[in-house]
A protein has these predicted regions:
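Intrinsically disordered, low-complexity boundary segments flanking structured domains
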Residues: 1-5, 51-55, 100
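Catalytic strand-loop segment that frames the active site of acyl-thioester-processing enzymes
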Residues: 1-33
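Generic structural detector for well-ordered beta-strands
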Residues: 3, 12-18, 68, 84, ...
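Intrinsic-disorder/low-complexity, polar/charged segments enriched in Ser/Thr/Lys/Arg/Asp/Glu/Gln
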Residues: 6-12, 37, 64, 78-80, ...
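Short, conserved micro-motifs enriched in small and acidic residues
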Residues: 32-40
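N-terminal glycine-rich beta->alpha transition that marks the start or flank
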Residues: 43
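Hydrophobic beta-strand-centered segment that forms part of the acyl-chain substrate-binding groove
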Residues: 47-80
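HotDog/MaoC-like acyl-thioester-processing domains
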Residues: 75, 84-138
């Protein structure tokens, strides 16, 4: 991780709430930004911020998220998500996030990500897959 990753670093992402990001269970007129989609977009914004400061052999994974989804956002509305680094503790990074649509604030969140070495992570995943195979074999 580069020394440039410090508290105060920010990233803003703008997107349009498309059909895939909405709920469907309230009919066509009830299509609004789904909470799971909002969480995914928040995680993506934080990940992009980290990648701006990561070495080429690094990636990040989510550890924890807390979200207050404050207001509905209609299909085809514009959303702006802003994430900022609050703390860096070794490879663990804490973010605060705000999101707003064209009319009002829609969410506040905190999110923690962990910076990982890609090659080491792949080895851990291979080891877990081998254990899974052994467990399934009985």
């Amino acid at each position: 991780m580069k020394e440039t990753l410090r508290p105060g670093a920010t990233k803003t992402k703008r997107l349009t709430v498309d059909r895939e990001r909405t709920i469907s269970f309230m009919g066509e007129e009830g299509r609004v930004y789904a909470t799971p989609s909002l969480i995914g977009d928040i995680e993506g914004t934080c990940r992009e911020l980290l990648l701006d400061h990561a070495d080429t052999d690094e990636e990040s994974v989510g550890m924890e998220i807390s979200l207050r989804h404050l207001a509905p956002t209609l299909l085809d509305m514009q959303v702006e998500i802003t994430a900022w680094v609050v703390a860096v503790d070794g490879r663990k990074v804490l973010f605060e996030i705000s999101a707003k649509d064209e009319v009002e604030p829609i969410a506040t969140s905190t999110h923690t990500r962990f910076v990982v070495d890609v090659a080491k992570r792949q080895e851990r995943l291979k080891a877990k897959a081998a254990k899974r195979t052994a467990v399934r074999a009985g």
